[in-house]
């Protein structure tokens, strides 16, 4: 009979632990937090040192009663919640809500970073008490977020419109997206020209290669700004003599990346699998907590997924090296194990990187047991871990400099300089298992090889290839690049990236267009108000400083109430000034539309889901209609106007204004120019390329045509 009680967060984790611990243990799930701040009020007594007033949600009372009953029959109690601040706080709240600390039953905290037999056994052999430093760091974060959210939101409701909200980290993320949009709209493209020449050692075209112009003969960089300049240079090059000036062979070594931490897993899952951060973390949690593997039962497949440490246990490194030697051969093993112990300066407690719990459990072996998305994420984690302990990849690179001279030229320069390069894989190393998304993007940038060239070799000119280009604005953030930017600025921690990205979309401050974040008008308005009246709240530097304070609280170096006391008075002072000085905004705009029911003019309003048309006779007439933004492109089916729309999932798409009579719709942004091959509709494809929806013809766009249309800023 079970006489030892173990409490965890989820039923899946409970099932996996039950299998490991055996019948003498009873494992119960709390289903997350059992106490929280109240939904209907601030729940913080500011005047009494920021004392939180926690409540037990109605749905948790039954769970608490069940845990108390199980605890009364147990000889000992183990709190086995997740190994981070949130997990520590859940354990503490469990104790407070159930009053387990008032009983004589021994109660201890156990911590493990993977749900395996060895890790769990070690944790139960080394129990400890609840770490109040970690609990207080979580409490401080929760109260900070509550103060900002509950104090700012009423202001936005009164001064802008009902239903708006602000958050400590989310508002910084929205500001970053809004600032990037402003950069894009302010950007003025500059014309420039790239000129390449095709050269060969002989008249045989098969052995030819291309070299790019980069300077005049004395090494001064050459900037060609218009077609006339390009034509003059091209004319010079047609009669020039080409000679090899320098040949620099070099061996390039590319080292594998460390195993995943939370942010890099989210970034690579977005780049390679197109998983959102939220989806990635949900799947990773399933892999961590355990999935049924046939006769094996429920098995934890990866280590804990919220971490900012690249450290890997020595036993896992040994297992990986043994596996690599057997499967790939000793040439794929570096002489010494690779160590990735360096952590971000703000890294939380002693975590491990995200890795498989058993290297020998290869992805193909799990195919019968995991669903497709679970298998894809597991394989990504498995390959990254294995590759991290493999030999470096080796490349033979050659950089060649070529001088073009024209003795008969009367130009003031004395020729031009060109460069060509090649990179040939000599040893694939870790890349037989895993390539980063950046490596995949770089493929094809260099020719596979150059002919054997020596200094002084004369080359045969075979043609000139001038290309008009335009400088590009900074790209909009994707989930991957926004997470990377937040991490680099020290904003948020492993547990906050996914919720932040989800929240800013759910509150309609940003939309996704072709996988890139674009602010809504509502997001721009709210961000501008916060930037003007609450500059510290939306300042990335200040937010990063607050995160560092939370880290110090977790280490026991800073009092949590002191951090709140330092933050709150200036925040309240700023809030009082905003209430006094911020005028109520009228977001209503006139339109040319007439109400179909009462013939009054219709006006443009901004709601939770973006712009819409409403009758100016409200409340007498409550007619509303969707507001469609024309993009200046005709529908290929009925020649109506194509308009920008937002789907129920908050994704941008483009449809016909004659809907429902015409149901044409497409996800990619249509381009005004017709297909040069068949005159059908072109849509944005990748980067500065467009693709025909009919014949699939691809064409390179000029200037800013490839940019998504922005919201007026």
Question: What does each model-found stretch correspond to?
Answer:
Residues 1-142, 151, 221-225, 231, ...:
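Intrinsically disordered, low-complexity regulatory segments
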Residues 2, 82-84, 161-165, 249-258, ...:
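Conserved short loop/turn motifs at secondary-structure junctions
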Residues 2-5, 16, 25, 97, ...:
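Basic, low-complexity terminal or inter-domain segments flanking catalytic cores
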């Amino acid at each position: 009979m079970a006489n030892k009680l173990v409490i965890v967060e989820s039923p899946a984790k409970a099932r996996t632990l039950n299998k490991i611990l055996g019948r003498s243990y009873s494992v119960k799930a709390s289903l997350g937090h059992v106490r929280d701040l109240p939904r209907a009020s601030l729940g913080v007594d500011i005047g009494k040192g920021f004392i939180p007033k926690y409540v037990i949600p109605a749905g948790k009372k039954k769970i608490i009663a069940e845990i108390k009953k199980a605890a009364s029959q147990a000889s000992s109690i183990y709190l086995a919640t997740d190994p981070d601040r949130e997990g520590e706080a859940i354990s503490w709240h469990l104790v407070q809500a159930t009053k387990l600390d008032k009983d004589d039953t021994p109660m201890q905290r156990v911590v493990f970073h993977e749900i395996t037999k060895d890790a769990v056994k070690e944790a139960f052999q080394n129990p400890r008490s609840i770490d109040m430093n970690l609990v207080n760091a979580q409490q401080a974060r929760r109260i900070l977020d509550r103060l900002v959210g509950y104090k700012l939101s009423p202001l936005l409701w009164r001064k802008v419109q009902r239903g708006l909200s602000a958050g400590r980290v989310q508002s910084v993320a929205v500001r970053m997206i809004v600032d990037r949009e402003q950069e894009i709209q302010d950007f003025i493209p500059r014309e420039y020209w790239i000129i390449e020449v095709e050269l060969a050692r002989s008249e045989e075209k098969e052995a030819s290669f291309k070299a790019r112009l980069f300077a005049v003969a004395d090494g001064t960089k050459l900037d060609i700004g218009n077609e006339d300049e390009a034509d003059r240079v091209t004319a010079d090059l047609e009669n020039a003599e080409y000679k090899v000036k320098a040949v620099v062979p070099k061996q390039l070594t590319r080292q594998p990346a460390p195993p995943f931490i939370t942010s890099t897993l989210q970034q690579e899952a977005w780049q390679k699998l197109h998983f959102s951060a939220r989806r990635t973390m949900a799947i990773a949690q399933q892999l961590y907590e355990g999935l049924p593997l046939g006769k094996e039962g429920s098995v934890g497949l990866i280590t804990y997924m919220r971490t900012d440490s690249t450290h890997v246990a020595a036993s896992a490194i040994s297992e990986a090296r043994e596996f690599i030697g057997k499967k790939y051969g000793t040439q794929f093993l570096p002489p010494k194990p690779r160590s990735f112990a360096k952590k971000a300066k703000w890294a939380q407690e002693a975590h491990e990187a995200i890795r498989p719990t058993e290297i020998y459990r290869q992805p193909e072996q799990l195919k019968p047991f995991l669903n497709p998305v679970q298998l894809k994420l597991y394989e990504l984690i498995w390959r990254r871990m294995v590759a991290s302990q493999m030999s470096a990849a080796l490349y033979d690179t050659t950089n060649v400099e070529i001088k073009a001279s024209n003795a008969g030229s009367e130009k003031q320069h004395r020729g031009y300089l060109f460069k060509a390069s090649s990179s040939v894989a000599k040893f694939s190393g870790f890349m037989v298992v895993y390539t980063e998304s950046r490596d995949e993007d770089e493929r094809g940038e260099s020719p596979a090889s150059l002919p054997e060239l020596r200094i002084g070799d004369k080359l045969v000119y075979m043609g000139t290839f001038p290309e008009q280009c335009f400088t590009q604005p900074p790209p909009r953030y994707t989930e991957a690049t926004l997470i990377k930017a937040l991490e680099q600025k020290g904003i948020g921690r492993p547990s906050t990236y996914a919720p932040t990205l989800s929240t800013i979309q759910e509150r309609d401050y940003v939309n996704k267009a072709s996988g890139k974040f674009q602010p809504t008008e509502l997001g721009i308005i709210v961000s501008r108000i916060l930037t003007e009246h609450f500059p510290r709240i939306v300042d990335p530097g200040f937010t990063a400083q607050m995160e560092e304070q939370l880290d110090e609280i977790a280490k026991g170096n800073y009092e949590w109430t002191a951090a709140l006391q330092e933050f709150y008075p200036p925040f309240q002072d700023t809030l009082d000034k905003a209430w006094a000085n911020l005028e109520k905004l009228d977001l209503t705009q006139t339109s040319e539309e007439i109400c179909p029911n009462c013939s009054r003019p219709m006006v443009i309003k901004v709601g939770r889901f973006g712009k819409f048309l409403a009758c100016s006779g409200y409340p007498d007439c409550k007619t509303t209609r969707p507001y469609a933004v024309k993009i200046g492109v005709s529908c290929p089916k009925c020649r109506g106007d194509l308009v920008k729309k937002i789907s129920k999932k908050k994704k941008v798409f483009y449809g016909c204004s004659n809907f429902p009579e015409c149901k044409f719709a497409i996800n990619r942004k249509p381009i005004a120019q017709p297909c040069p091959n068949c005159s059908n509709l072109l849509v944005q494809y990748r980067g500065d390329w467009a693709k025909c929806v009919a014949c699939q013809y691809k064409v390179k766009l000029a200037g800013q045509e490839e940019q998504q249309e922005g919201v007026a800023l």
